[in-house]
Amino acid sequence: MAYFIDRRLNGKNKSMVNRQRFLRRYKSQIKQSIAGAINKRSVTDVESGESVSIPNTDINEPIFHQGRGGMRHRVHPGNDHFVQNDRIERPPSGGGGSSGQGSVSQDGEGEDEFVFQISKDEYLDLLFEDLALPNLQKNQHKQLNEYKTHRSGYTSTGVLVNISVVRSLQNSLVRRTAMTAGKRRAIRLLEAELDRLANSEPVQLLEQEKIRQEIAELRQKIDRVPFIDTFDLRYKNFERRPEPSSQAVIFCLMDVSGSMDQVTKDMAKRFYILLYLFLSRTYKNVDMVYIRHHTQAKEVDEHDFFYSQETGGTIVSSALKLMEEVIKERYDPNQWNIYAAQASDGDNWADDSPLCHDLLANHLLPLVRYYSYIEITRRAHQTLWREYEDLQARFDNFAMQHIRDQEDIYPMFRELFQRQLNESR
């Protein structure tokens, strides 16, 4: 029975190379399709794959062909309709029209746009391409280092459970080859001499017997070389290395006053989901802290954060104070990469906005990697926006954007996290 072993890198997915080439070639068209599709999804369906359509005009290959008109001589294969010197009428030009996407001919046949499915990973790669986390610094603790075990080559000492059989046998083969190479070479020379004496006249029996004894002694010496020796043994070596902190926490602060309707909350939720997916691709562990506020702030779970009917007036500083308390209790800035995203319609008690400015400037912004504020409203900006504009001018880790419609969410998100020119890729 014959066994075939497929050692190709893409053996299980033989078209992967062509697929990757296609994604690179038509990246701009695919990104345009994704940017439009992100706004049509439900808030719980941001992480799945996507069906992408590309107009046929964008994927047509350039070809060399004869232009229209002119006099040309062609050689056609023979058939039962024409004979030599017959004149063939020019076919009429296509007059079919189309009111939709794709191409339509005069006989009713057409061609749809090219549609294909991209996977979740491909979708997220294109969704977050050219984006980077601002002020990204993986924490390296001095007192509370996190250690992770890594492979670190091989060692000649160790426990039996870590023995490397393959490396040990390789060393055994090298040692036995080195120790017996001279003896095997001598045996080959003696065997050649023995053949010469056997064919020589007169026959030298004593000399032949002496050579046979030498060959036997050499083979005994070769057999006495141990197959495996403690010198050959190699063990897999492991070492513990300090790891930079790879954990982050996102504080989601949302105004739930009476002016924040469900449509506004859904737009805020889309932003929070994009932020979570973006951070989870950078950090291994991402915690979410949900804080709702009206006149009072409360930490809640995800369901209550988006769907609770509790409402009231608006005091934004209550959420900022609660965020500071949670950081002190559970999230040491030396161990956690802290991010915050605040969503509001901008409506706040006028006397509270200066307090929000003070809390952010003196208490929160020194602790967080990045603080983003989105104001979802079609009205004119109020005191909270003006206070935050001063923070944006003073702090590099503070950013703010204005959202009017659902279509603004993804472009605004890219503006907040666009990779800076001086950041390494």
Curated annotation (Swiss-Prot):
The organism's place on the tree of life at top rank: Bacteria
Record-linked Pfam families: DUF444 (PF04285)
Stretches for region Disordered: 49-109
InterPro entries the UniProt entry points to: UPF0229
Composition bias type Polar residues, residue spans: 50-59
Biased segments, Basic and acidic residues type: 77-90
Family named by the database record: Belongs to the UPF0229 family.
Protein name: UPF0229 protein SG1344
Organism: Sodalis glossinidius (strain morsitans)
